[in-house]
Every structure is written in structure tokens, then in C-alpha cells.
């Protein structure tokens, strides 16, 4: 099922009991951040939150934890809310194979209802607050930022839709952090080499299929809009920006048009990041906002970031697993079974594979490290046998504890690249990486003494169903 806009998805969540509307007055700080943290603490079935009465703001509405649970993630895919995680993974992989899905272009969009072209003041337009108490200011952290390759502007796939943290630096200024591993950093370098500003458009309050696509580690020339269409099973709707040639999500609640100022930098940060730590302040580029559009009575969406798990981990979980899975299958089409890279955006990945010969699992681990996402993330790759479910951590721990020999099966590779936000990197952006081979040795490897593994009694599956039926009576 394709949701036409953010509001339609919220309505679907409400119908399924996965949206909690709060009408009592709340304070922007600390209530909004605390409520999102509390929702995450409730477990992997927690609801989205919609606040309609925020102290200090008139008619402001804020949504949080929108896809911060597996039921909500399943509904984003148009699946029943009780769909198991592994089934969501394989369904996402199936839809990934439908990429690219052509887009549907529209002439106008709901956010054109209101247009601000002068005296722009983001402090008046947006209900701003700090997510975590140590943040260095107000941030937009779940907005889709659109930019385009300047060397190949007609290549639709090289238009990027990404999610980057942006600090409100003034009434019409934002600081942005374009880390080197992200496409927008390439676009900014192209602009600054030419001595020109980089046009950008920022969309807030989008339906979750595009925020999911925007946080998926696609190849440089793969379109997030065409991926969003593949995920939802029908063309994704876009509309042209008025100040540039950029395409914008049709269903956005608020849209900001502007440009990154060439050569200009300001101190940005600190900010509580997806790693569960604050990242320190750095000198970062500045966006000048020139025009603002918004729907009547817009809904502002925010993303809580903190110690995992939070909504961020659901948003960048399965959509990180699937590209790694597909890229590994390109190299080993008959062996790769599944990939779990849901933890901290794939800084650790677990790969289930068949083994063709001795040492094969280590080769799989090497390939994972050199995928586009692996280059900037994947610090540790755990490789397990085909009969070990990488989404079942007790099984993975069993494989590590019984199959891995620390002397022979731990491979450490020094001084590889990682995103600078990794708090363990030293210097920032450089780290050692490790492959842990937790597969059963096959010839010509002869170490260990592995007898036939235990299996389940013959009627176990039938008894599982019988017990579930009895529990549900």
C-alpha cells in the first residue's frame, strides 16, 4: 500500500492502534525528547506519538517515533503490523529487486498552500527544541535534503536525497554536516571548486517511504525517488522546486529552499548522535534559506537519537541490511543467505552464508568491508553458517562461542576508513576493522572436532503451532 502523504500514514497508524495522540500541554524541553526516549524504552512494539498542544507555540503539531517500532515499520511496507522482522527483511529485498521504479511528476503539491519569500524566520515557522540536553542548539534531524551532481545535472540518479543533521544557526541559516561518505559532500565539493553556491531543497514531514529510501546506502547514481517507488510498489510522486531544478517529495509538510554558501563555515555541534554519544563541535557549511512553503496547520516531524534502540535504529535497520545483502549476492549468488546489519547503521554486520571451501567465509567478510556502505561503516563482520539465523542473536552467540577459534578466525585489518562520527576511530575517520569467522570449518581446513549438530525432534513445528493456538484461545 502506498501512502500519499505523511498524514495518511499517521491515520493508518491510528487505525491500527499504533499512534498515541497527546492533547495535554507539554513543554518542548524536556517533555518531547523524554517522551520519545520513553516510547523507545517500551520495546519494539511502541506507538508513534503526535503532540497537539505545545507550550509556547500556537497550533504547532509535532510527530515523533513515527517508525520507531517493528509494527510501524511493517505498516510502512504495507504489511500486517505483526509481520516478523526476518519476513520484513526478505520482503524489502524482493522490492529492492524492482528498482528502479519510474517517478510520477506533479505540477503542484499540498505544501504550496503557503509561501514565504521575505522576512523568513525559522524560529517563528518551526516548533524548535533540543532533543538531548547536551545538544549545542536546535536541530532538524529527519528532513530530506535534496541536491544534484553539477558535473552530470541531467542524470536523475545523481540527484541525491539524504538525511543530514542541520543546526538552526539563525533566522534563515542552517549548519549542515556533510560527512565525506555521503553524496552531498561530492556535490558540495563540485560547487566549491567552481566557486559557486550549491542549491538545496529541504523537505520536512515526509511519508516514511522516502525517509527510508533517503537513509538507505544506495550507490551514487541510484535514485532515492526510484527506490521509494520500488519499496511502495508504485511510482513515487515528486514536484519541481521553484528556485532550482531540484525535485521535492510531493507529500511533504514543510519545504525550505536555499543554497549552501561556497567557502563559508561556522562552528556546529555538539549533537547527540545515532552512536549513542555526543559528537563534538566542528566547522561546517552553512545553508542560506531563501523561501519556505508549508501546508495549512503543518505537522513537524522529529527524530529522537540516543542510546540504541531508538526510532533511528528502526529507520536505518532493514534498509541497511538489504543493500549489503544484494551486493554480497552479486559476488556470491549461490551462497549468501541473509545479512543483519541493523546495529548502529551497520557498524557491525552479521552474514549467513554457505561455505564452498576452507577460507571462504573470510573472503565473504572481506567483500562486506569493501561494499559502498562497508567502506564507511562495517567495523566488524561476523560470518556464520547457512543454518544460523543472523537475526537470532542467541544463535549468533552460539556460533561465536562454539565455532570461532580466536587464533585462526579473527582477522584484523589496520587503518581503514570509517565515518568520522564513530567515537572509537583514531584519528577521527580511521579505524582497524575485524572479521570473525564463526562458520564450521570445511576442507582443506581440518581444525576442531565438530560432530553432527543437534536438531529438533520430528514434530517440533507442529507443537509450536499447537501451543500458539492454545495460548491464543
Curated annotation (Swiss-Prot):
It comes from the Bacteria. Its cofactor is prenylated FMN; Mn(2+). Keywords: Aromatic hydrocarbons catabolism, Decarboxylase, Detoxification, Flavoprotein, FMN, Lyase, Manganese, Metal-binding. GO terms for biological process: catabolic process; response to toxic substance; ubiquinone biosynthetic process. NCBIfam families: UbiD family decarboxylase, VdcC. Involved in the non-oxidative decarboxylation and detoxification of phenolic derivatives under both aerobic and anaerobic conditions. Phenolic acid decarboxylase that catalyzes the reversible decarboxylation of 4-hydroxybenzoate and vanillate. Could also catalyze the decarboxylation of salicylate. Is not active on di- and tri-hydroxybenzoate derivatives. This is Phenolic acid decarboxylase. It comes from Bacillus subtilis (strain 168).
